[in-house]
Amino acid sequence: MEDRRLVHGAAPPLTAVERFLYGQKNDALCSKKQESSRDQPIVKTKISIETRSDNKENTTFGPTREKHLVLNGGNRNPTGEVVARSAARDYQNSTKKRSSKNLIKGQWTAEEDRKLIRLVRQHGERKWAMISEKLEGRAGKQCRERWHNHLRPDIKKDGWSEEEERVLVESHMRIGNKWAEIAKLIPGRTENSIKNHWNATKRRQNSKRKHKRESNADNNDRDASPSAKRPCILQDYIKSIERNNINKDNDEKKNENTISVISTPNLDQIYSDGDSASSILGGPYDEELDYFQNIFANHPISLENLGLSQTSDEVTQSSSSGFMIKNPNPNLHDSVGIHHQEATITAPANTPHLASDIYLSYLLNGTTSSYSDTHFPSSSSSTSSTTVEHGGHNEFLEPQANSTSERREMDLIEMLSGSIQGSNICFPLV
């Protein structure tokens, strides 16, 4: 009994040496297991993304996956077996759908149309994916559009009648270029056919063949039957639309022009009485020039007329616009004022020249032969511009002798500059 207890009883505790040896054995076993797991074959299958361009529709057939098939030597793993089956199935599906990459994007042939009609009768008008699988080279969208726009049995392919064009015009006035909505209102006409008819009518108006067709139509009006004539309801409607657009553009341009005219008014609007700016500004000045001309034409001013001699102490110049005297004697001013009051004014003779032009030429160039007798004194009787000052104070106003009895005239600028420099007193005649 004791031996059995020793055999079946609890093991005695291990010593330090036994624990060390036991750890070494465990490490060896772990390393062997790792080596055996490395030697096992690993099968990897990669399935790439399959993308199929189906008439502007991209369909992705599943993500990329990596599946590891682990076979433990001769023993087959059931999980690995399932993964292998799914990988094989995916590979078969990918090979099937890879063949549908090469789609035909050209026109449909008569054979394809007949096959599509037969498939639609078998599967109906909704299962386009199934129909496209049996129709090689065509996508589901291509089959659907071909059927609804061309192969449907209720589609009208003859010319448009006046009633159809009237419905088209009325619907276009209400909803605009919504061809799908208009197609619901016109039985037998698809969205594509309505749009094509609209564009063809518009292009026919703008083409150069229009005049030839009109001339031929005028010649053949008597022979042509009413059914052969093309309805012109849509054509007239398109013309009215274009005419309205042109009128709108013209109105906008007119509004822009009126705004620009209002922002920049003319002088004729300012002077509404018919007087121009030159006549308004030139009226008073012409009268003043006539006044000066009459004075100097009838009463030329000189030192002798003023009762002054050249031997006086301070004598200043006389010009055609007034007197400048630097003399403290008040009697001199009185004599000048009296002489100015006693001067008589006579109206000048009517001449084709302006008084301002004659007066300026008289100031700058002296008197001419044609006007010396009527308006201004002759060169022999014209006065001289003299300035007598003590010690020659003002060189600008020095007298200039002339051997030919012509005396230099002084213009307004020289007269004013002399009056400012000499601090002279100016007595205007006006």
Swiss-Prot record:
Keywords, ordered alphabetically: DNA-binding, Nucleus, Repeat, Transcription, Transcription regulation
DNA-binding region (UniProt annotation): 128-151, 179-202
Expression sites by tissue: Expressed in ovary septum and stamen filament.
Name the UniProt record assigns to this protein: Transcription factor MYB119
Basic residues bias spans: 200-213
GO CC annotations on file: nucleus
The organism of origin for this protein: Arabidopsis thaliana
Subcellular location: Nucleus
Biased composition (Basic and acidic residues): 214-224
InterPro entries: Homeodomain-like_sf, Myb_dom, MYB_TF, SANT/Myb
Source organism, top-level taxon: Eukaryota
